[in-house]
Amino acid sequence: MLSLAHFLVLGAILFAISIVGIFLNRKNVIVLLMAIELMLLAVNMNFVAFSHYMGDLAGQVFVFFILTVAAAESAIGLAILVVLFRNLDTINVDDMDTLKY
C-alpha cells in the first residue's frame, strides 16, 4: 500500500525535474512550456494525494479546474508560438527581445 509520503516524494521529484528543466534549457520555448506543465502536474498530484488521504473530494475537484486552466494556458502559449515562428522563423528565446514585430 502506498502511503501519503510516497506520493509527496514523487510530486517533489517531478517538481524538481521541472525546475531543472527550466534552468537548464532557457533557449527553447516549447521545452519551457513543457517544464511548466510538468510543474503543474506535480502540484495536482499532491492535491489528489492530500484529498484522498484526508477523505475530502474538494482537492480532486480543484484539480479539474487547474487542468482546465492549464489546457487553456497551453493552447494560448502554443498559438503565440506559432505566430512568433511565422514572423521570426525561430522559437529561440533570445531572438524574442522586443514586444512588437
UniProtKB/Swiss-Prot annotation:
Instruction: Extract one GO molecular function annotation from the record.
Output: quinone binding
Q: Which GO terms describe its cellular component?
A: NADH dehydrogenase complex; plasma membrane
By what name is this protein known? NADH-quinone oxidoreductase subunit K
Query: Principal place where this protein is found?
Result: membrane
Similarity comment: Belongs to the complex I subunit 4L family.
EC number of this enzyme? 7.1.1.-
Please name the Gene3D superfamilies in this protein's record: 1.10.287.3510
What job does the chain carry out?
A: NDH-1 shuttles electrons from NADH, via FMN and iron-sulfur (Fe-S) centers, to quinones in the respiratory chain. The immediate electron acceptor for the enzyme in this species is believed to be ubiquinone. Couples the redox reaction to proton translocation (for every two electrons transferred, four hydrogen ions are translocated across the cytoplasmic membrane), and thus conserves the redox energy in a proton gradient.
Q: Note the topology in the membrane.
A: Multi-pass membrane protein
Give the source species. Answer: Cupriavidus pinatubonensis (strain JMP 134 / LMG 1197)
Q: Where are the transmembrane segments?
A: 4-24, 30-50, 61-81
Q: How does the annotation summarize its subunit structure?
A: NDH-1 is composed of 14 different subunits. Subunits NuoA, H, J, K, L, M, N constitute the membrane sector of the complex.
One GO BP on record is:
ATP synthesis coupled electron transport
**Among its keywords, does the record have Transcription?**
no
Question: Which InterPro entries did the record assign?
Answer: NADH_UbQ_OxRdtase_chain4L/K, NUOK/Mnh_C1-like
